[in-house]
Amino acid sequence: MLENWFAPIAMHQIVRAPLDAWQLGARIRVHAGDEFPSLKGVRLAIVGVGASDADAVRSQLFTLGFPFEGLKIADLGNIRNDNLSFLIPVLSELIQNRILPLVIGNDLYFGLSLYKALAGIVGQLNLVLVDAEIPFQQHSTQERNEAFQALLSSKESGLFHLSLLGYQTHYTSPETVRMLENMNADLLRLGMVKANLPEIEPFIRDGDLQLVHINALKQAEAPGQVNPSPSGLTVEDSCQICRYAGMSDKLKAFGLFGFRHEYDHRNATSQAVAQMVWYFFDGFYHRKGDFPASFDGLVEYIVELKQADYPLTFWKSQKTGRWWIQAPAGTSDNPQRHHLIPCSYADYKMACQDELPERLLSAFKRFF
């Protein structure tokens, strides 16, 4: 039973004043006493790892508004044991019951529990990571890097594709970048993300799992982290990224990591993380269900490209206007849900001009 795995939340310590009916903390099911919340109809579940840090986020999150009529969310409380082997079966049970776990943890290392839980269910998966640093640095002795390195080095890890967003070149070894480029990973530096935020939406839409590290935000926006940087994303950038993630029909798990309450200043970071969670909820609430389980509701566009040996097939959702490109034929050995690669209208227009973005050329290489 899940209730045995979670410690309840002390609501009187988290929320000092009574909540109004319009506020989020009064509208979701909270594990706040002896009775564990019913998960019937629940679609999102908050899981805290590191009670003091997760509770600091809750104190800000619960006071925000709840305009998500009909969306059932549960806060299960804080995990009693933060060992990965303890976390994985809990998260697996949620995912298998079609409940998306949203983990708030104080270290990115706990993101591995989400990864392993999901990989055990879906097999090969696409990982989207938002981080100022690359936690795959070669020859690093840090435990976090060694753990994530195992995802790249083992064929049994289940990693089909990696998208790394917002990393900063001055924190990254060139050798690591070359290694990931050779793996056809999507690598978007901080400047590329900030230059055109809407164009990163297809990268996010392709993820089965998204992990966001708070160190992707600049220190002025989020001081409550271990190694803050003067450069990084703003809270507005991060909230938009989280909203894109929530809107993705393909996404099955999500985590926000790296917040440390003891380093925070006037609750700036806990407020930022709470807003990021809120915008993830907002994206989830506005899901359109247009991830192509079938081609119904999609318009087909075929583009003949001189530099390609085959025509390119684009698909556009009539419901949302979002775009996909179909992986080339002869790639049936790969997971079917990965065969439609999210793209943008700008990608389609480039193809019509006999050009294909490097990103899509790289994406095709995954299938050969």
Where are these regions (language model features)?
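Conserved alpha-helical scaffold segments that buttress catalytic/binding sites
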Residues: 2-256, 260-368
